[in-house]
């Protein structure tokens, strides 16, 4: 017959249990903190915050191709290499596609029909980002026809009998098409990762959701159509995932609304968006701009492009602070790399200017607190070169500029840069175990948990034995 332990033993056992649970939670929390640098990212005024209020700044990159590459297990090494290089250079944010609408390599081949191999590719991307301490900004569709986008949604609707839809911009006001888009949003956000077992909407690796890459609307230059669409879709995303941040995906073009600095638009043209009004919409947590002076001002001289860069950046920083009170990210920036050393020097000069503007704002407490260059590639990916690529191992000067900027932002974060680098390196060395189906699980905190459990059992037995003869 078992006898009850004395009160002291019971209390001691309870304390042990509490300590054990606390230690287990600490291990889990440590893993979540490493997932991207500090758990789920939130917003406090013009700051991004983690860990209950610590400010975080972002040194990032674009790599739209991650899911596509990872959908083929034989090519997943390129994804791992990209994250490894990013982490080694202090990058902590990656912007990539969570869509591929129709076409030859679709994620969504038709409305509501998904390719599991492609989805597992996205699963792998998220798992690898987590392993290397990189946050992800996931974009949900495209304004342009690359990888489907608006045009593919319209084609699906027309194929279903909705022949009244003729233009790509009908995407923004068609009830049918908006239903297709919402279904995609729900499918992606509620997806359970086959490598981590965590639903996307619950994964702290994900920094946020971008409604569309570079929304534009020629059919309505005033911006009203895009505005209404964002006002509907941002709250819809929030209704499924109330934890992660949401942004519209704008390039920063001004419209015809109040406080819009429309004279700053390239060539003074309207693009059907309103930088200020759209970023004021409910459910939109932060503002974005893109920066391509050599493309937007094609044929202009270096001096004119430099003046545009300064005015564009400064205007958006001031307007974000004055009218939005939200953080601002440059989610794309780049300069086309022509052949020759001279142009590479110009590209690196542009890179330094953008990064300096980000740092100057962040260091002064301004709203511009991060950016992501277009685009990161690995060696041997020549077919994806677009003239904007940065391959860190082969461009030492660009790599040095990026690393220096990342270090500066990490120091603003109040982080020990070398300790952060070592922690990310240790985490990256943890393997993802893949079973015969191609699915996997990260080793994560399992070893630490087992050690804690064994220690708990041993200690509990030793405490119990002290009173076994009472």
Language-model segments: which ranges?
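Basic polycationic patches enriched in arginine
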Residues: 3, 426-430, 439-441, 455, ...
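A recurrent domain-boundary module in secreted/ectodomain proteins
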Residues: 394-436, 459
């Amino acid at each position: 017959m078992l006898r009850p332990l004395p009160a002291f033993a019971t209390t001691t056992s309870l304390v042990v249990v509490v300590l054990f649970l606390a230690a287990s939670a600490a291990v889990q929390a440590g893993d979540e903190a490493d997932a991207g640098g500090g758990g789920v990212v939130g917003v406090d005024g013009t700051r991004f915050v983690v860990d209950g209020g610590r400010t975080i700044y972002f040194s990032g990159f674009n790599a739209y191709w991650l899911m596509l590459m990872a959908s083929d297990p034989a090519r997943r090494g390129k994804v791992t290499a990209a994250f490894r290089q990013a982490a080694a250079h202090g990058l902590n944010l990656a912007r990539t596609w969570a869509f591929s609408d129709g076409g030859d390599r679709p994620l969504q081949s038709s409305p509501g029909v998904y390719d599991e191999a492609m989805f597992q590719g996205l699963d792998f991307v998220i798992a690898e980002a987590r392993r290397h301490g990189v946050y992800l900004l996931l974009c949900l569709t495209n304004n342009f026809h690359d990888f489907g986008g608006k045009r593919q949604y319209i084609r699906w609707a027309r194929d279903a009998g909705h022949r009244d839809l003729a233009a790509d911009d009908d995407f923004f006001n068609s009830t049918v098409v908006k239903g297709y888009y919402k279904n995609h949003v729900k499918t992606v956000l509620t997806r359970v990762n086959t490598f981590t077992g965590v639903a996307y909407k619950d994964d702290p690796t994900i920094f946020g959701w971008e409604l569309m890459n570079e929304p534009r609307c020629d059919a309505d230059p005033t911006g009203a159509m895009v505005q209404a669409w964002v006002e509907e879709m941002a709250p819809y995303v929030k209704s499924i995932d109330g934890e992660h941040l949401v942004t519209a995906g704008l390039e920063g073009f001004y419209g015809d609304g109040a406080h819009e600095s429309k004279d700053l638009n390239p060539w003074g043209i309207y693009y059907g968006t309103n930088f200020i009004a759209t970023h004021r919409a409910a459910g939109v947590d932060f503002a974005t701009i893109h920066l391509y002076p050599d493309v937007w001002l094609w044929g202009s001289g270096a001096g004119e492009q430099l003046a545009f860069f300064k005015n564009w950046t400064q205007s958006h920083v001031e307007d974000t602070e004055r009218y939005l009170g939200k953080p601002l990210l440059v989610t794309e920036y780049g300069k086309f790399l022509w052949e020759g050393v001279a142009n590479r020097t110009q590209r690196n000069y542009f890179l330094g200017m953008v990064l300096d503007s980000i740092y100057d704002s962040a260091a002064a407490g301004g709203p511009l607190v991060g950016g992501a260059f277009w685009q990161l590639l690995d060696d041997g990916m020549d077919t994806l070169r677009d003239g904007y690529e940065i391959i860190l191992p082969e461009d030492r000067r660009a790599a040095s500029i990026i690393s220096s900027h990342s270090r500066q932002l990490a120091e603003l974060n109040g982080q020990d840069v070398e300790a952060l680098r070592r922690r990310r390196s240790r985490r990256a060395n943890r393997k993802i175990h893949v079973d015969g189906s191609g699915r996997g699980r990260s080793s994560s905190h399992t070893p630490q948990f087992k050690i804690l459990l064994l220690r708990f059992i041993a200690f509990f037995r030793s405490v119990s034995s002290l009173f076994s003869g009472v």
